[in-house]
Amino acid sequence: MFGKKCEKYVRNYINERGSYMSITVNLYYIGTNGNARKFAEDMVSSGIVDAVRAEEGNERYEYFFPMDDPETVLLIDRWKNQEAIDIHHKSEMMKQIAELRDKYKLRLRVERYVDEGK
């Protein structure tokens, strides 16, 4: 049952856009003393998360907390295409994000996945 729902979603998605492409970036924010989680909480409470989600081309922006690593926060960030990412990276929000990351002395590990379809 889940498979058919998923297939229907993908078909509708492709039909709406003619083709699809998504770029998913997994960002692991790594800190100490709970700072990664504090960073994510500040991102939400400051409104930055809502602002990123409202940007043209953003398809997903969600934080997750690994059960086996309390000092890491995973952000799954998905965009329609590279152009949307480039615009986001030049935005004022990126400066705010960098300032928060510096405030909490976080390290960053990045994984990038491209899903293309015609």
Segments predicted by a language model, with ranges:
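Residue-level signal for well-ordered alpha-helical positions
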Residues: D42, F64, H88-S91, L100
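Short amphipathic alpha-helical segments
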Residues: N35-N58, M93-Q96
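Short, Lys/Arg-enriched N-terminal segments with co-localized hydrophobic residues
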Residues: K4-Y20
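Short N-terminal leader segment in a subset of presequences, especially plant chloroplast
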Residues: V10, Y29-G34
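Short, well-ordered beta-strand segments in beta-rich or mixed alpha/beta enzyme
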Residues: I23-I30, R60-H89
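Glycine-rich beta-strand-turn "strand-cap" elements at beta-sheet edges
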Residues: N15-G18, Y28, E59-E71, Q96-K118
